[in-house]
Amino acid sequence: MSWQAYVDDQLVGTGHVIGAAIIGHDGNVWASKNLSLKAGEGAKIVNGFKDSASVLSGGIFVDGQKYLTIKADDKSIYGKKGAGGVVLVKTGQSVLIGHYNETIQPGQATTVVEKLADYLRENGY
């Protein structure tokens, strides 16, 4: 399956995220739909997994929007803005990003992104 197919079918296609992307550990976008990272955001996202204190204190930027970080560790970063938010999950080679709005429960978005990340980790990605 291509990276774009994972974004289209396993993330956005579930209806539990409205936008998604997969980026490499270098911050470059591998695939995306309804989500566009601005210059430098990918690298800052990847760095947030190494330096959780920076994203906990300064928030996380995705698609030009700042999100209040509500969880950050070396595997997951969750951000909130109003009733929407973002779920970022690191795998061995990539970072999955899911964006949800007020019509989607945060837990639904989190489950979809975390499950795909688990699958990719189990398969060496």
Curated annotation (Swiss-Prot):
CDD domains: PROF. GO terms for cellular component: cell cortex; cytoskeleton. Signal peptide: none annotated. It is found in: Cytoplasm, Cytoskeleton. The modification N-acetylserine is found at residue 2. One of its GO terms (molecular function) is actin monomer binding. It comes from the Eukaryota. Keywords: Acetylation, Actin-binding, Cytoplasm, Cytoskeleton. InterPro entries: PFN, PFN_euk, PFN_sf, Profilin_CS. Pfam families: Profilin. Belongs to the profilin family. Occurs in many kinds of cells as a complex with monomeric actin in a 1:1 ratio. Binds to actin and affects the structure of the cytoskeleton. At high concentrations, profilin prevents the polymerization of actin, whereas it enhances it at low concentrations. By binding to PIP2, it inhibits the formation of IP3 and DG. This is Profilin-A. It comes from Physarum polycephalum.
